[in-house]
Regions:
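Gly/Ala-rich beta-loop-alpha elbow adjacent to hydrolase catalytic centers
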Residues: 44, 48
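Patatin-like phospholipase
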Residues: 1-43, 53-380
Length: 380
């Protein structure tokens, strides 16, 4: 017989999982010590799966946050380094018995790739049983496997345990992509049982989440992290938002009386660490990147080249410098293509208009000639 549990579910987030870490830090300090382990569960997708696994495995969240934000320097202008940084964190902090603590308490959302007749190519899958700590690491890495940034081919997971949640796979050596944003209405992946009390956490600010930023955060922060000071503001915002939600009437009723009484007073609303102007500045940055999209790849490549030269990595810098010779051509071709298509379309429209004008002129001339001939005939 299944027991009703308190389940915290973390959405896909990319670098915005720093907000998730702030929420997790509050839970680890003020909520989880007052709950029995079998009464609480976690679920997550992509970066949210890493945070959920950290809570299930008893990892020090504050120490993990310092490591994650410390990777900002090498990942700021190179989104391809985001997943190697995640692999490094998983290998460094996941305890040897992490799979034992996660079994039955952690659900990880994946996107399975199937090549079969009369079956969809992509589909959601939730994994909650882990054969070993290596298997747990593979599942977490697969849930973060963003296409292109992590590779074109799906990430291979060697083994899926025989005891699985509903909807899990039945095979070996399966290929997976990032868990992305599978709606809970289509696939019930967040909780273990329908009787569970669910708290949804979203770093992107989805309106259906229980704990979320007050305003939607800029989307490019998912792959291109903001400065470390802004990341620490995100961490503090997650901590404060969790405190306000769980201490309020909406979230407090879901907690046992002893847990709610032990919670510290939430911070005042006016002490929010994420000012509106900072979020607005991020959205303005995203708008600028969107307008100047053809110039973004060479810009990021130049910044990466400067960092490589600063670290003395001359061999990689030479390769990147040669690649920059082709980068402007690759970046300008969308503008050239748009210009050619627009010119062709406008030229065709102009030719049609000119033809219609000439036809109208000819028709008017013919009509006036006929009218003149009729008047001349009547006069005769």
């Amino acid at each position: 017989m299944s027991i009703s549990r308190l389940t915290f579910s973390f959405d896909s987030s990319g670098w915005l999982y720093v907000y998730h870490l702030g929420v997790a830090h509050y839970l680890q300090r003020h909520v989880l010590p007052h709950l029995e382990a079998e009464r609480v569960a976690f679920s997550g997708s992509s970066g949210g799966a890493l945070v959920a696994a950290a809570l299930a495995g008893g990892i020090d969240i504050e120490q993990l946050a310092h490591h994650v934000i410390g990777c900002h320097g090498r990942c700021r202008f190179n989104p391809f380094r985001m997943l190697p940084a995640a692999e490094e964190a998983i290998a460094k902090y996941m305890p040897p018995d992490g799979h034992l603590m996660a079994n039955g308490r952690l659900r990880v959302l994946l996107t399975r790739v199937r090549l079969a007749w009369m079956r969809p190519l992509f589909g959601p899958e939730a994994v909650s049983e882990f054969a070993s700590v290596a298997h747990l690491r593979q599942v977490l890495r697969a849930s973060c496997h963003i296409p292109v940034l992590g590779g074109v081919l799906p990430y291979q997971v060697d083994h899926i345990g025989t005891s699985r949640a509903r909807g899990a796979s039945r095979g070996y050596d399966a290929g997976y992509y990032d868990g992305v944003f599978w709606p809970s209405v289509l696939y019930m992946w967040r909780a273990f049982d329908a009787s569970d009390t669910l708290f949804k956490v979203s770093g992107l600010g989805w309106p259906t989440a229980h704990i979320r930023p007050p305003l939607p955060l800029p989307l490019h922060w998912v792959c291109l992290p903001p400065p470390p000071t802004t990341l620490w503001r995100l961490f503090a915002a997650g901590y404060d938002d969790a405190a306000r939600r769980l201490h309020g009437e909406g979230g407090g009723r879901a907690l046992p009386d002893g847990v709610r009484a032990a919670l510290p007073p939430p911070p005042p609303a006016h002490a929010a660490p994420m000012p509106v102007w900072l979020i607005a500045l991020g959205w303005a940055h995203l708008l600028l990147l969107t307008c100047l999209f053809p110039l973004v790849p060479p810009y990021l490549a130049c910044r990466e080249l400067l960092q490589l030269q600063g670290r003395g990595d001359s061999k990689t810098a030479v390769l990147l410098r040669r690649g920059l010779l082709l980068a402007p051509l690759l970046a300008i071709w969308p503008l050239v293509l748009a210009y050619l298509v627009t010119r062709w379309a406008c030229g065709r429209v102009l030719r049609e208009l000119i033809a219609l004008h000439d036809e109208g002129q000819a028709h008017a001339t013919a009509t006036s000639t006929r009218d003149a001939a009729r008047r001349e005939a009547k006069r005769i």
